[in-house]
């Protein structure tokens, strides 16, 4: 019985690649130094899988930045602005495409399906010339072979590559990207020929777009592509790998009818209906099924007994020698190795498996199917599963009851938004076009040092409070000097907008090295939600009250919303996600009510990640949006009309969920908008009625560039063309945490000046 891993984390157990990349980008190390770190990482990963007994070990899943960018490099699809003149693509061109350089901007980055990983979006058009320009896939196959490891080279499939691309600047938005199929397939044929010549016997094409809602034209492209590649692929075993959702019946039909394909990989964790499809529609005889039964997107130990039952039912359909045990997707979406978690509670640790442990699980399942079951390993796993099911740390009956009572009720504030805004204005007395910021202010080296030393118990609580108090006082003073209307305390006490709350809620655990790649060298360390969530004590009230006592202007209380906490964590898999979300919402509700009782009149509940959690298939959108929006409303349904509830959302694509945003019933919403002005404003231009306050970001905080007063005023005027004067707010598009004060002060000065300039113009026009 064979085993397979779809892909593996690239960063290394201690983020070795991250530090090597950043050192190279900063000019502190050479290309050779970077390549040495990468070579060592690849070798250790291949050795680890070979030692674990994995039969089908992937190669070319390593990347210096992103696998879609690697594919663009392989195809020589370099946008003109990078002045590439041909030949093998080196680091200079590659990293310019990923990150931009002094003279040209980077390519766009967007989320990889519904994960928290981001890929570089290829820019294509009718004049894009393709040529074989990066031999990475072949080189890495040969590299592994020289180490005595025969691997399965992995390529992003040609159809998914095109479907994930976008028309380049200046190309019609309606340009048919799939029309380029005949132009890219010759390059794929060259790569395949080289891999065959190097001795490859298997090849894996990742075609995850097969799980999306595809039309007949798009499905026909799959048939056309793999029919065209048929002769090039002859003599090779070909695996088409899909992941992240159920495969629709039509896509399954298309996929299983491809002659050139030997094997199909399915995600059986997020794709439970695919199991039914295999059973009802049948499976082509003589073909391999790579069954993704070990979750590549979470950190929970697999329930081996349950997986074995699933595999045995599949074995009866596809045959013993044609079933391969696999992961549901690449393991790059989970943490690297549990061995590095020396401080994690031992009971919780027994419930977990990171990438290295999942490799062992896959092999244990394959051996069990082959009649070589490791009884001790399975018994330990069963004991851990039982402990997790019965542990009193997981279940809090009071929380369970409170969350169950939420179902079926609506949780809306009693008064409509226009009446609430009137009541709030009487109390807050804000000018037209009120100014505010999103929450965080720059986090200096000194500030990070204070937090680090307090955590390590190197400074006392008194010293810590004194240092944070001083920082808040500085931030309040700056905002008053700038004449901002609604202030923030700057969040100097917070390391991360999710971790800060998770550390104070029950049901959360934290890792020391549970890093997951987000994009390029950037990694995130998601908290683990292992049990019922509750709030033992107030979390932010002390700091918010302190900040409000320093000013007569309104001070915003700052909270992270339940959907964002959920979407940016590793979530328990023993109950539906919405139940966990409702529990978090109830905890945040208590905090909102305590802030209000403490005299905080404006409370912001960030839902930066609400859009991110949207399922891949349209049929599932309504259910998700219903519970996500309901969770937000739960947090603030009990406040008075005079308390103003703000929310903040990130990323651009709101047009398809605008009605859900309105349904959140916030008093004011601020939106990250500066990179996609027209996209957002077009919604309102098309007649969507929005009655609450709204603050589309007037400048991009992700850039060090300082916008002029005129530029911001021009942007505000464009907004006023489609939005009422009395609902528009003026604010940056995101928090200022990553910027420096010498960038923040002039940018905010110009922002306030622009608001005042337009107020004057509006007053004189009356």
Curated annotation (Swiss-Prot):
Give the location in the cell: Cytoplasm, Cytosol
The biological pathway it contributes to is: Amino-acid biosynthesis; L-methionine biosynthesis via de novo pathway; L-methionine from L-homocysteine (MetE route): step 1/1
Lineage from the top down? Eukaryota, Viridiplantae, Streptophyta, Embryophyta, Tracheophyta
Q: What is this protein called?
A: 5-methyltetrahydropteroyltriglutamate--homocysteine methyltransferase 1
Q: What is its EC number?
A: 2.1.1.14
Where does this protein hold Zn(2+) 1? Answer: 648, 650, 672, 734
CDD domains given in the database record? CIMS_C_terminal_like, CIMS_N_terminal_like
Q: Which UniProt keywords apply?
A: Amino-acid biosynthesis, Cytoplasm, Metal-binding, Methionine biosynthesis, Methyltransferase, Transferase, Zinc
Q: What exactly does this protein do?
A: Catalyzes the transfer of a methyl group from 5-methyltetrahydrofolate to homocysteine resulting in methionine formation.
Tell me its family: Belongs to the vitamin-B12 independent methionine synthase family.
**Chain sites annotated for binding Zn(2+) 2:** 659
* Cofactor, how bound (note): Binds 2 Zn(2+) ions per subunit.
- GO terms assigned for molecular function: 5-methyltetrahydropteroyltriglutamate-homocysteine S-methyltransferase activity; zinc ion binding
């Amino acid at each position: 019985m064979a085993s397979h891993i779809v892909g593996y984390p690239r960063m290394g157990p201690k983020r070795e690649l991250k530090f090597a990349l950043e050192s190279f980008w900063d000019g502190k190390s050479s290309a050779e130094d970077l390549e040495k770190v990468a070579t060592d990482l690849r070798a250790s990963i291949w050795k680890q899988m070979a030692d674990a007994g994995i039969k089908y070990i992937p190669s070319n899943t390593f990347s210096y930045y992103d696998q879609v960018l690697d594919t663009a490099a392989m195809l020589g699809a370099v946008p003109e602005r990078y002045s590439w003149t041909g030949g093998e693509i080196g680091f200079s061109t590659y990293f310019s495409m990923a990150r931009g350089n002094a003279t040209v901007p980077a390519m766009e980055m967007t989320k990889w399906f519904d994960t928290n990983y981001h890929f570089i979006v290829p820019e294509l058009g009718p004049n894009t010339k393709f040529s074989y320009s990066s031999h990475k896939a072949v080189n890495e196959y040969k590299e592994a072979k020289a180490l005595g490891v025969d691997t399965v080279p992995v390529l992003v499939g040609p159809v998914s590559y095109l479907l994930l691309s976008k028309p380049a600047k200046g190309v019609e938005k309606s340009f048919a990207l799939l029309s380029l199929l005949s132009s890219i397939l010759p390059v794929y044929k060259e790569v395949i020929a080289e891999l065959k010549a190097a001795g490859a016997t298997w090849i894996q094409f990742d075609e995850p777009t097969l799980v999306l809602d595809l039309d007949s034209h798009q499905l026909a492209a799959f048939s056309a592509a793999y029919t065209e590649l048929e002769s090039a692929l002859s003599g090779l075993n070909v695996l088409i790998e899909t992941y992240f959702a159920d495969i629709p019946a039509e896509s399954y039909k298309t996929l299983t009818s491809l002659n050139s394909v030997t094997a199909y990989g399915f995600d059986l964790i997020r794709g439970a209906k695919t199991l039914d499809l295999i059973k009802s529609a049948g499976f082509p005889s003589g073909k391999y099924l790579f069954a993704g039964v070990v979750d590549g997107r979470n950190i929970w130990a697999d329930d081996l007994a349950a997986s074995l039952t699933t595999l045995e039912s599949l074995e009866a359909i596809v045959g013993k020698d044609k079933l391969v045990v696999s992961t549901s997707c690449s393991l790059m979406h989970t943490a690297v190795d549990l061995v590095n978690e020396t401080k994690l509670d031992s009971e919780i640790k027994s419930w977990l498996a990171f990438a290295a442990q999942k490799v062992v699980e896959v092999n244990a399942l394959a051996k069990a199917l082959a009649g070589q079951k490791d009884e001790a390993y399975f018994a330990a796993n069963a004991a851990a599963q039982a402990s997790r099911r019965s542990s009193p740390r997981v279940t809090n009956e009071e929380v369970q009851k409170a969350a169950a009572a939420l179902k079926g009720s609506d949780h809306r504030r009693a008064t409509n938004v226009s009446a609430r805004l009137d009541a709030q204005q009487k109390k807050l007395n804000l000018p037209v076009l009120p100014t505010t910021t999103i929450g965080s202010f720059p986090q200096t080296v000194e500030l990070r040092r204070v937090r680090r030393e307090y955590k390590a118990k190197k400074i006392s609580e008194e010293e810590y409070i004194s240092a944070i108090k001083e920082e808040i006082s500085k931030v309040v003073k700056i905002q008053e000097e700038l004449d901002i209307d609604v202030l923030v305390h700057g969040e100097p006490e917070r390391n991360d907008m999710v971790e800060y709350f998770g550390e104070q809620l029950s049901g959360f655990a934290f890792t020391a090295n549970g890093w997951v790649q987000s994009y390029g060298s950037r990694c995130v360390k998601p908290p683990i939600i292992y049990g019922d969530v509750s709030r033992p004590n107030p979390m932010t009230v002390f700091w918010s009250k302190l900040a409000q006592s320093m000013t007569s202007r309104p001070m915003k209380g700052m909270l992270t919303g339940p959907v964002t906490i959920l979407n940016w964590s590793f979530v328990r898999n023993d109950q539906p996600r919405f139940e966990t979300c409702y529990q978090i919402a109830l905890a945040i509700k208590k905090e909102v009510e305590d802030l209000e009782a403490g005299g905080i009149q404006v409370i912001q509940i960030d839902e930066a990640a609400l859009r991110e959690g949207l399922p891949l298939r349209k049929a599932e959108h309504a259910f998700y949006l219903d519970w996500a929006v309901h969770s937000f409303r739960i947090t603030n349904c009990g406040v008075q009309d005079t308390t103003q509830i703000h929310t903040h959302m990130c990323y651009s694509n709101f047009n398809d969920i605008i009605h859900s945003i309105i349904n959140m019933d916030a008093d004011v919403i601020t939106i990250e908008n500066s990179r996609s002005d027209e996209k957002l404003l077009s919604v309102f231009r098309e007649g969507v009625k929005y009655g609450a306050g709204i603050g589309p970001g007037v400048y991009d905080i992700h850039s060090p560039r300082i916008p002029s007063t005129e530029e911001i005023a021009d942007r505000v005027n464009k907004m006023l063309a489609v939005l009422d004067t009395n609902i528009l707010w003026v604010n940056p598009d995101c928090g200022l945490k990553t910027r420096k004060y010498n960038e923040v002060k002039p940018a905010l000065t110009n922002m306030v000046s622009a608001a005042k300039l337009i107020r004057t113009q509006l007053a004189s026009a009356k």
